[in-house]
Swiss-Prot record:
The lineage of its organism: Eukaryota, Viridiplantae, Streptophyta, Embryophyta, Tracheophyta. One of its GO terms (molecular function) is 18S rRNA cytidine N-acetyltransferase activity. This is RNA cytidine acetyltransferase 2. GO terms for cellular component: nucleolus. It comes from Arabidopsis thaliana (Mouse-ear cress). Keywords: Acyltransferase, ATP-binding, Nucleotide-binding, Nucleus, rRNA processing, Transferase, tRNA processing.
Length: 1028
């Protein structure tokens, strides 16, 4: 049966087409898909052109296949079963066949960026996230429709209790009940959107959309040519510049007056060719920033610029930029392949994105993409374009600036807007520098211009869907943050707990407080996304605290927010879960610090501790460096230690937010056409003083952030100690992720009261040793100041410490560390007998021992830093000169002082040990005589004489006395004879004549022989006696 469509629906669509405003329809019911054909038909008649294109987004499955052949078979089966009305079936299939429908999975929604559709259909509401909602709605052109299909809902309030797919990521082992605050706020916000209609599957408008009850046709202010005022101004600008080359042809490619003026401003800077000139272009999403930059770069090529570089977080962000560079070339009558070539990347990570354009019409010119951290390639640059600068870390953006022309663009709101406070910090600094006189310093005296685009390309200004989406997702909150009325002393400020039920209730005052709080987070140095809002609203473990000054209750106004802290409760993980995670090598969502601690130290007890992780801490941009952040951290620490309110003994009865309350209690008792949805009235207070709420029982507070020197020093100042630094830096920010802990005073843990780190001390020492060993490889490029802050070495030792008696950790021996030869080389270096190359290996050894606090030698900060750079990071002297701004001679002088101090201590500890270990020659012991020299000579002479006598007697030979031998007969005769008076006897010889009278010559030779031997014997005896 045919039914007349409510005229207000048709009027809303036609008004949107006339004003180039988008309209939104929320259809509730199982047959909501059938009404899409009717809405598409009404839109086609209103736009008076070809059928509007359709984007159909879904989770994982379509009711009717997007494949033509499969769809025909599927529709045939449904027709045979009688499950579809043939008339409706034919209309729907006709829409799919000729309606230019693009189907897209939610997980693949990034590929639709930059495309424009006339109608967007969103089904499977449970899979939607704030990011997906913003990303898909932004693709709809002015006059188009956004259709949200909600099936299987018995009432509108059942949307508040719907379980979303993203809730699985919010649940942890100790916090398993996710809330539906975001959906409740989403539902209530639909009533405030003037271009949104909520209806059932029969196109009956529900009471929630009572605001369109009196909708009427709107007149359009157009001239005889059918142009609006903005369109007339743009036409006039194009006509005025039509004769100017090359800006005239480029202006014809602009779609809005703002975009045209931006191109003219860019081209003025190009022709000026002033050094250190910066033009900044800021706008919300969809204003044509990248297109304006592309046209301006095409004009720079025509003006003769040769080296043009473009940088962005990823080449994917430059698709529109390079597209409009080529369109600019077409307008200037450049021909591809004849005048220029487009080069695509071969890197698979860049997905064949355009990275270079080579131009060779006039002379060789290049438009080249570089990554943000490659600033060293800018030596020959003439024009640098920085697109999406807000997504690049602020220090990196500053390093890219130099003595050349810079075009800078950034999204300051919308779902791509980031919270790097680019417009509040960098642009403010550039503006101040441009006003200051040139002093010769870097960055001074630069020319700075700022352009802001307000008119959207896709839809007309004042689009109600854009306003609704910005308010729902807190996207355009830059104007919602007023300056504090005063800056009270941090000691006078108090920390308050924020009740999230009241915060997301869509009450007027609560909504204003939420917008200001999110504006404060966006203006801080954190990168934000719309998904963070849903996490903040629905995650059961997350809590909010705000620091406020003294509140005057007599004034009925919202107090100024000085600081916001977002806290996530973690821990209470069973030991079985921890063991399972170690075995599988996979950590579940949430509980970042417990899982990372368990992974790093293989400790299964720590995940059972309960703790709180500070997700973010954001201070008002006009109250920075005033102590409010430190005051908030101190108050939060005291609160969780039970110093402000007593800690609850029964943890299950902690007064957290109340359980989610239904928007209307009688919703299930009335029909959908009679259901009234309004904000709750019986809400608890938004702000709760800490002394009125019992804190959870915790063992520690932790924090995780991108490692920078200022942030690390802030947390170390509050006694947080690191236990993890990621070895691989972030591809987006270039920062290493760092996690720190601060143990809280707890009666359940037995620790040494004098140790401020408590149970965490041994883990912290182990981390420092591991970090020092990684400095030569993974953290070699880390700034020495940051490395010194992470290690936090003790460099000032008292005299009692230097003696080694106050600590058992000091070196007592050099066994296994330095050999005696090493000590000799070190001594030679300290005495200037050799150069540093001879002791470079010793420097690395001593550096590790010193930073492990085993050498109690007091050094200055600069001396310790040089030891760290050379010994731990193993950098060269040129790098140290560049980082520390010191001359090489100064570095060598300081290094020599370090070596002398270390050698002095080592020599005192193990000096005797070193001497005993060195090899040496054997020494002889000489003793004095007990007698005088004269007595010694006389005694020696006496000995010689006695020896000579003895040798003389023994020297007589038998052969020499043979001639005097008496034979036997002669002896017998002598016995019988008498001796004469003369004493001579005569004996008869028995030998022959020759025998008795041997040869005279023989006698003579024997005589000479005896005489010579006798003389030799005497002379040898004399020499022997002299020696003795």
């Amino acid at each position: 049966m045919r039914k007349k469509v409510d005229e207000r629906i048709r009027t809303l669509i036609e008004n949107g087409v006339k004003l180039r405003h988008r309209s939104m329809f929320v259809i509730i019911g199982d047959k909501s898909r059938d009404q899409i054909v009717n809405l598409h038909h009404m839109l086609s008649k209103a736009v008076i052109k070809c059928n509007p294109s359709v984007l159909w987004c879904y989770k994982d499955k379509l009711d009717i296949s997007s494949h033509k052949q499969k769809r025909s078979k599927q529709l045939k089966r449904l027709r045979e079963r009688g499950q579809l009305d043939p008339e409706k079936l034919d209309a729907f299939s006709r829409l799919l066949d000729v309606g230019r429908v693009t189907h897209c999975l939610y997980k693949d929604s990034e590929r639709i960026l930059g495309n424009t559709f006339g109608m967007c259909i969103l089904q499977d509401f449970e899979a939607l996230t704030p990011n997906l909602l913003a990303r898909t709605i932004e693709t709809v052109e002015g006059g188009g429709l956004v259709v949200l299909i909600l099936r299987s809902l018995t009432s509108l309030t059942s949307l508040c209790t719907m379980v979303m797919d993203v809730h699985d990521r919010f649940r942890t082992e100790s916090h398993s009940e996710a809330a539906g605050r975001f959906n409740e706020r989403f539902l209530l916000s639909l009533a405030s959107c003037k271009a949104c209609v909520v209806m059932d599957d029969e196109l009956n408008i529900l009471p929630l959309s009572s605001h369109i009850r009196s909708i009427t046709q709107v007149p359009t202010e157009k001239d005889s040519e059918g142009l609006s005022e903005a369109e007339r101004d743009l036409k006039s600008l194009k006509e005025d510049l039509s004769d100017d080359f090359p800006v005239g042809p480029l202006i014809k490619k602009c779609c809005t007056l703002d975009q045209g003026k931006a191109v003219v401003t860019f081209f003025d800077a190009i022709l000026d060719k002033a050094l250190r000139s910066i033009v900044a272009l800021i706008a919300s999403r969809g204003r044509g920033k990248s297109a304006a930059l592309g046209l301006a770069v095409a004009g720079a090529v025509a003006a003769g610029y040769s080296n043009i570089y473009i940088t962005a977080p990823s080449p994917d962000n430059l698709k529109t930029f390079f597209e409009f560079v080529c369109k600019g070339f077409d307008a200037l009558e450049y021909k591809e392949h004849l005048d220029y070539d487009v080069v695509k990347s071969a890197n698979p990570d860049f997905k064949k994105a355009v990275v270079r354009i080579n131009i060779f019409k006039q002379h060789r010119q290049t438009i080249q993409y570089i990554q943000p951290h490659e600033h060293e390639k800018l030596s020959q640059v003439e024009l640098l374009v920085i697109d999406e600068a807000a997504a690049i870390p602020l220090p990196v953006v500053k390093s890219l600036l130099g003595p050349y022309l810079v075009f800078l663009s950034s999204t300051v709101s919308g779902y791509e807007g980031t919270g790097r406070s680019l417009s509040l910090k960098l642009l403010q600094q550039l503006d101040e520098q441009s006003r200051a006189p040139a002093t010769g310093l870097e960055g001074s005296g630069c020319l700075f211009k700022k352009i802001e685009l307000t008119e959207s390309i896709r839809y007309g200004s004042g689009d109600p869907i854009e306003s609704w989406l910005n308010g729902l997702l807190c996207l355009d909150v830059a104007t919602c943050l007023p300056n504090p009325a005063c800056h009270p002393s941090p000691s006078q400020c108090d920390l308050y707990y924020v009740n999230r039920d009241t915060l997301f209730s869509y009450h007027k005052d609560s909504e204003l407080f939420l917008q200001r709080m999110m504006a404060l987070c966006v203006s801080s140095h954190y990168k934000n996304s719309p998904n963070d809002l849903q996490l903040l609203a629905d995650a059961p473990a997350h809590h909010l605290f705000v620091l406020l000054g003294p509140v005057d209750e007599s004034q009925n106004k919202i107090p100024d927010i000085l600081c916001v802290i977002q806290v996530c409760l973690e821990g209470k993980i069973s030991e079985n879960s921890a063991l399972q995670s170690l075995r599988d090598g996979h950590s579940p969502y949430g509980d970042q610090i417990p899982w990372k601690f368990c992974e790093q130290f293989r400790d299964t007890e720590f995940p059972g501790f309960s703790g709180a992780r500070i997700v973010r801490i954001a201070v008002h941009p006009n109250a920075m460096k005033m102590g409010y952040g430190s005051a908030a951290v101190e108050l939060l620490t005291r609160y969780f230690e039970g110093q402000i309110a007593p800690i609850s003994e029964a943890e299950d009865k902690v007064d957290v937010e109340h359980a989610p309350i239904k928007v209307t209690e009688a919703a299930e008792k009335v029909s959908m056409l009679e259901e009234q949805v309004k904000p709750r009235t019986n809400l608890p207070p938004l702000l709760v003083p800490l002394h009125d709420r019992r804190p959870e029982k915790l063992h520690y507070i932790g924090v995780s952030f991108g490692l920078t020197l200022d942030l690390f020093r802030f947390w170390r100042k509050h006694n947080f100690a690191p236990f993890y630094v990621s070895q691989i830096p972030s591809a987006v920010t270039g920062e290493h992720t760092c996690m720190l802990l601060k143990p809280l005073k707890n009666d359940e843990l037995e620790v040494n009261e004098s140790d401020e780190l408590g149970f965490f001390t041994p883990f912290y020492k182990d981390f420092k040793i591991r970090f020092s060993k990684l400095l030569s490889d993974k953290f070699k490029k880390m700034d020495y100041k940051l490395a010194m802050s992470v290690l936090n070495p003790k460099i000032n030792f008292a005299e009692v410490d230097s003696s080694g008696s106050s600590s058992g950790g000091f070196l007592k021996t050099l066994n296994g560390i330095l050999s005696p030869y090493d000590m000799e080389r070190l001594r030679a270096y300290t005495e200037n007998l050799t150069d540093f190359n001879l002791v470079y290996d010793i420097c690395k050894t001593l550096a590790h021992q010193y930073f492990e606090e085993k050498l109690p030698v007091s050094l200055s900060y600069v001396q310790a830093s040089i030891l760290l750079c050379l010994g731990l990071q193993e950098t060269d002297f040129s790098s140290i000169e560049r980082q520390m701004q010191l001359e090489r001679g100064q570095i060598h002088s300081l290094l020599l002082k370090v070596a002398r101090e270390l050698y002095k201590y080592l020599n005192g500890v193990a000096g005797k040990e070193i001497k005993s270990a060195l090899p040496r020659l054997k020494e002889r012991e000489l003793t004095a005589h007990n007698v005088s020299v004269d007595d010694d000579i006389r005694e020696g002479a006496k000995q010689v004489e006695e020896q000579m006598k003895k040798e003389k007697i023994e020297g007589l030979m038998d052969s020499e006395l043979q001639q005097y031998v008496i034979g036997d007969k002669e002896a017998e005769a002598l016995q019988h004879s008498k001796i004469s008076s003369s004493g001579i006897i005569s004996v008869k010889s028995t030998k022959s004549e020759n025998e008795n009278g041997f040869d005279k010559s023989t006698k003579k030779r024997s005589s000479d022989k005896r005489s010579s031997s006798s003389s030799k014997s005497k002379s040898s005896k004399k020499r022997k006696s002299l020696k003795e």
